[in-house]
Swiss-Prot record:
Species per Swiss-Prot/TrEMBL record: Methanocaldococcus jannaschii (strain ATCC 43067 / DSM 2661 / JAL-1 / JCM 10045 / NBRC 100440)
Localization terms from the record: Membrane
TM region positions: 6-26
Cellular component terms per the entry's GO annotation: membrane
Protein name (record): Uncharacterized protein MJ0275
Keywords: Membrane, Transmembrane, Transmembrane helix
Membrane-related topology note: Single-pass membrane protein
Length: 204
């Protein structure tokens, strides 16, 4: 067998393994967590057997410099902002100023709903392992000017439920997540605006 054919076979096997690892899911279900009116974020607060937290995002240092490129009148202007994540910030202040219709406070996290969008700020990594039980989960590592984050697509095994999407990132010692049922530029812009606002709270 030629080296070219061997290389093609190896690449195919590696691609297959990667696909299975990303989209893997389990078969067990519990009716309590499968209520149509519960979001993925709300289900996170229900204990599921053998829960394992998702891998932590890469740790950020207490102080961070971020360079933003701004295009103004066809000229590229670079601005560097410094962030100090050791600053004490009230979790309740980390939400955008929106007319939220629901708010839930826990010891280590706050959940707020605006229309059909859910926002969460947490002091601990948010456990999404249960989502792999009830959904086909597609995970997309992303990066923007503020660093790394993860974009999730949750496709319910129950065909009567809607597909949802989550943006998840670590900001200093906090974790923020935004869940929406809309895959659009509007949702992306809202996530970016919220990220920008949260980072602004830690500016030096």
């Amino acid at each position: 067998m030629s080296m070219k054919k061997v290389s093609i076979i190896v690449l195919f096997i590696l691609s297959l393994i990667l696909t299975i690892s990303i989209c893997g899911c389990f078969e067990n279900e519990k009716e309590e967590v499968n209520k149509p009116n519960m979001t993925v974020i709300e289900k996170e607060n229900i204990k599921v057997q053998n829960n394992k937290p998702i891998e932590n995002l890469k740790e950020e240092s207490c102080k961070l410099n971020i360079t933003n490129d701004e295009n103004r009148t066809n000229n590229i202007t670079k601005t560097t902002k410094k962030y100090d994540f050791s600053k004490p910030v009230d979790m309740d202040k980390m939400f955008l100023n929106l007319p939220y219709n629901e708010e839930t406070d826990f010891d280590d996290k706050i959940i707020k709903k605006y229309k059909n969008i859910t926002f969460v700020v947490s002091r601990k990594p948010i456990d999404l392992s249960y989502a792999y039980i009830y959904n086909e989960v597609k995970e997309y590592p992303e990066r923007d000017i503020f660093g790394n984050y993860i974009y999730y697509e949750f496709i319910p095994k129950n065909a009567n439920l809607s597909i949802s999407y989550c943006y998840y990132r670590k900001v200093g010692n906090y974790y923020i997540i935004m869940q929406t049922y809309e895959k659009s530029r509007k949702a992306n812009d809202l996530w970016m605006n919220w990220t920008k606002y949260v980072f602004s709270l830690f500016e030096e």
